[in-house]
Amino acid sequence: MRILALNPYHSGSHLTFLDGWTKNSRHEWTVLTLPGRRWKWRMRHAALSLSRQIRAEIGRGGRWDRLWVTDMLNLAELRGLCPPAVADLPAVVYFHENQLTYPVRNATERDLHFGYSNFLSAIAADQLWFNSAFHRDTFLEALLRLLTRMPDYGHESLVSDLRLRSLVCPPGIDTWPDTGSRSAGALRILWAARWEHDKDPDCLFRALERVQQRGVAFRLSVLGQSFAELPECFDTARRRFREQIDDWGFVDDRDRYHAILARADLMVSTAVHEFFGIAVAEAAAAGCIPVLPERLSYPELYGAEPDFFYGGTATELADRICALDSQLQTARWLELQAKAIELSSRFHWTRLAPMMDDQLQHVDRRRVLGERAMGNGHTAEDATD
């Protein structure tokens, strides 16, 4: 099949996802993109800008069987701006995130127009794909709350139709070579996330202070992209843990990033927001033992091993790290490491890409709003069962 993929924010996880799928797919792909910056402006103009790219591709002979777009594009607008050859294609919207439940520091900062654009895009799609069941459920619940607040014509009844057309299709990761046995030394702790408040880095550093006070030796790698408004705790932590730090900051070289993951023992998350957690999946595939708060998408993805979780506070995280340190290189440690690798193997592209290829092939154009798209009854959600 010939697939037209539109990625209005072509950077970070959005780029990595599409690159991984297309490399492992049996379909033929045309990928049209816009740079991954200024997300609000991208959401405003993406339909117009990409429709012009599409017309140019059609002029060069482009023809497609399916349309695949991300949540950063208003599909309803795009259908209106494109010729029938594209406007009438069966279409999937993939939700990496959404603008109703994506975190903001202050509730007054949320522009509900972008969330409503997500709604219109979903209505225009034949299927909605989410990276986790947690994401699907929280989005649809928030959408229903939003629509019931409208003064009239809220169209709340359409939310149940969207749920029927929603599938869980987690992002894939590359297969990981055997890293061999662990080298000697202190416990190696990894934290990899955006350096923003919704990842709660302060919880990590408060927990590490407690670990240090208990006399547990550790090495530390703190990775991730930083922005203009950097939480103050990073500068404080860099000074406090300067003797323990091995890696600090954003790593744009994939080989170096993989090497850091391969030598780490624990992958710690302190997130208060996470729709999937690709960094955790990659670290687990490398043999890191996940240390996760018992919330968000994590229980859905890693709940088969209770010892991967802590209660969510800095004290509970410190307790979990110290408990794992006492098990370093024991039989239980090796069991946990093997379980992490096993659970993450569900997300290998070699497994997920064929399943998503199949699902895309079974997407049909709905003729009437509210009519469920026909399919084969199997989805990429099976990969996480």
Give the residues covered by each predicted segment.
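A charged, aromatic-enriched C-terminal amphipathic alpha-helix characteristic of glycosyltransferases
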Residues: 41-45, 329-365
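Donor nucleotide-sugar binding/catalytic pocket of nucleotide-sugar-dependent glycosyltransferases
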Residues: 123-178
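Conserved donor-binding/catalytic core segment of Leloir-type glycosyltransferases
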Residues: 170-199, 205-212, 220-223
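Nucleotide-activated donor-binding/catalytic signature segment of Leloir-type glycosyltransferases, i.e.
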Residues: 232-255
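Short alpha-helical donor nucleotide-sugar binding micro-motif in glycosyltransferases
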Residues: 258-264
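Aromatic "clamp/platform" in nucleotide-sugar-dependent glycosyltransferases that forms part
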Residues: 272
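Short hydrophobic beta-strand element within catalytic cores of glycosyltransferases
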Residues: 289-292
